[in-house]
Design a protein with these regions (language model features):
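A short helix/loop element that forms part of the nucleotide-sugar donor recognition site in Leloir-type
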Residues: 24-37
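Carbohydrate-associated surface elements
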Residues: 14-17
């Protein structure tokens, strides 16, 4: 927009906010979903649209390389690749796919993991943060981001120390990062605290609404 208006129009980017009152940190063992599923160990979760743009083949390739049986993967959502994920999970003891979950259940299912996976397709950087990221932060979950390091979410992760970055289409690097995170799982508490703090401050609803008010006043 700035380029098209040649600087003649003031442009301000206001992000979405986190639903901090509806979503907050819980131990995964205290969630309804965790107690319904036959899943254990250290859990990485991908929740959201399971489409072609999410780089899911890369994730599945990385999972196939992970040999540590104490690491599990939970996929939640629907989309064009849902049947592929379901079939993959039927072949892997440490992979579970449960399909679409209602948004009203976010507090429960976002907390049914130790680390949340977020992806962003190539060429999408600069267009904002994947919306699910805000409530992942509200749940106090570290983010394993797969995508361009110049993207908004990558910059957010680096600035506030709320997760890790892996370049897309590199299953070996992703596998190594997954294993690194597991090996250093005892140090996650500071990242968890950072995630919730960012949701409570930078992406608090009141703060975002005040920015709209200031802009429109």
């Amino acid at each position: 927009i700035k380029r098209k208006t040649k600087g003649k129009t003031k442009v301000e980017l206001i992000p979405n906010w986190a639903d901090n009152k509806e979503v907050f940190p819980l131990r995964k063992e205290d969630t309804r979903l965790y107690n319904q599923l036959e899943i254990s160990g250290f859990i990485f979760q991908f929740a959201g649209n399971l489409g072609y743009a999410q780089g899911l083949d890369n994730i599945l390739s990385a999972i196939s390389l992970v040999e540590n049986k104490n690491i599990s993967f939970l996929f939640i959502g629907g989309g064009a690749k849902a049947e592929v994920i379901k079939a993959f999970g039927e072949q892997k003891e440490n992979v579970i796919y449960i399909g679409f979950q209602e948004r009203s259940m976010q507090k429960d299912f976002l907390n049914t993991c130790d680390v949340a996976i977020v992806t962003l397709s190539d060429g999408m950087y600069g267009l904002g943060v994947p919306s699910k990221s805000y409530n992942i932060m509200a749940a106090g979950k570290p983010i394993l981001y797969i995508g361009d390091e110049k993207s908004e979410i990558a910059l957010c992760i680096k600035e506030y120390n709320i997760g890790w970055l892996v370049k897309p289409d590199d299953p070996y690097s992703l596998k190594n990062m997954i294993e690194y995170i597991y090996q250093n799982k005892d140090s996650l508490i500071s990242i968890q605290n950072n995630a919730r703090l960012v949701a409570d401050t930078v992406f608090a609803k009141e703060r975002i609404l005040n920015r709209y008010y200031a802009l429109l006043s």
